[in-house]
């Protein structure tokens, strides 16, 4: 769409997160900085109802428990019924059997529109061999673009692989997003924030492939701008929020760096 950020700030979509306890505060603030409204409702007694009044659902398995996974399934079912986008951030898949089983349970039980993870996490979900150290990517043994395309076809979801270059595929098309800065990898939480950003862009754009590209371009441009004013991770994190808050569609269009394959 022509002016997604303007649309977000005018409509202020409510983005329901069931996310991890490490970065929940960061995801809420990043959602707000873009102009959307965050809500973090995890309890099974209310989560589906909260999803029912939201414009997108973002699930993050960074700190999984059986109870939280149950809430994710309830909310995702409500999102499917309402036909709002569901984003799954597969944090730490490949690190433990429990995470792998819970991710598979979600994907096997409900419709997930956008599946996000680093190269290792997506490779593991796609059945490829991959090495993961905690929640950090280490290495994969196959072409990531090929993995993204094949997994998108298999899952009927948009696949987002984040790394030095971000790979997005709907099974037929591929975007390679080159915006961003290495300082984004120096603070905990930018990957989780990226999932929130994808969710809020998908809330206003039903083309989830295009929405994912827009989200990562906008977030990456903000990272580039923040790095110019930063001396290290601490100042960078503060500046990242400020640059997102001060972004405009015109500014991002002049700095977008991506290619389509």
From Swiss-Prot:
Binding site for ATP: 116, 162
Residues that bind substrate: 40, 189
Gene Ontology terms for molecular function: ATP binding; hydroxyethylthiazole kinase activity; magnesium ion binding
InterPro entries: Hyethyz_kinase, Ribokinase-like
Catalysed transformations (reactions): 5-(2-hydroxyethyl)-4-methylthiazole + ATP = 4-methyl-5-(2-phosphooxyethyl)-thiazole + ADP + H(+)
Cofactor(s) for this UniProt protein: Mg(2+)
Annotated transmembrane regions: none
Domain of life: Archaea
Protein name in the entry: Hydroxyethylthiazole kinase
Species this chain originates from: Methanosarcina barkeri (strain Fusaro / DSM 804)
């Amino acid at each position: 769409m022509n002016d997604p950020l303007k649309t977000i700030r005018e409509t202020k979509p409510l983005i329901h997160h069931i996310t991890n306890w490490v970065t929940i505060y960061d995801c809420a603030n990043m959602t707000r900085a873009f102009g959307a409204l965050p809500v973090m409702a995890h309890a099974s007694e209310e989560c589906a109802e909260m999803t029912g009044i939201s414009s997108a659902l973002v699930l993050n398995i960074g700190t999984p428990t059986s109870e939280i996974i149950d809430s994710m399934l309830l909310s995702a079912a409500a999102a499917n019924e309402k036909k709002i986008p569901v984003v799954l951030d597969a944090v730490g898949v490949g690190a433990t059997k429990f995470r792998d089983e819970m991710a598979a349970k979600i994907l096997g039980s409900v419709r997930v529109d956008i599946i996000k993870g680093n190269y290792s996490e997506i490779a593991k979900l796609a059945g490829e061999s991959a090495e993961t150290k905690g929640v950090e990517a280490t290495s994969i043994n196959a072409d990531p673009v090929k993995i993204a395309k094949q997994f998108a076809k298999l899952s009927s979801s948009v696949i987002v692989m984040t790394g030095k270059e971000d790979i997005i595929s709907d099974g037929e098309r591929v975007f390679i997003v080159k915006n961003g800065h290495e300082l984004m990898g120096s603070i905990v939480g930018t990957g989780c924030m990226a999932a929130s950003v994808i969710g809020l862009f998908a809330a206003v754009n039903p083309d989830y492939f295009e929405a994912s590209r827009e989200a990562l371009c906008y977030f990456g441009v903000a990272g580039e701008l923040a790095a110019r004013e930063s001396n290290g991770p601490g100042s960078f994190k503060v500046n990242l929020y400020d640059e997102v808050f001060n972004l405009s569609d015109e500014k991002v269009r002049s700095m977008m760096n991506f290619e389509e394959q």
